[in-house]
């Protein structure tokens, strides 16, 4: 109820004379309410999206990430997924790219997920050093987890070739360790990674990953 009160008091848009604390409270309240599909916040976010539909980068940066997430949660269409990916490719704003990566991961349609996975190996869409952010966001979502985990295993040789000299390569060992929490996923993690402990560059992270998941199961 407190978040609803904060939203009713502060609204969606920043106002003249507001304090930094007001903005922080707004962000926290909106994040919770949009995740909870609280209709007044959902409708307000949708209204902001519609007002900027022709140029979603122009959505006020302070609420843009939440507006993009809300639209994906509510619309969940292949067209919107394509729009977000196209915006990702054309923008020069790294913060906007991060917001788009997070927002598109809220999709719950297989067609959209297949489309995204089809783009990940195209360096003109996703730079190899940014791939881990897409992996982390999608792997953490229950709808996408199985498909994305299998994609990573199936494309491991390509990931290793593309990122073997980049520090973000370690993320593909560490990210699932930070997310997985079932015995089934632990067994899969061990089956895939344990044979790779002969690679000294990966051994420590793999063994730590196994311990991390096991402690959570």
What does each of the following model-derived ranges do?
Residues 1-217:
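Long, ordered, helix-rich scaffold segments
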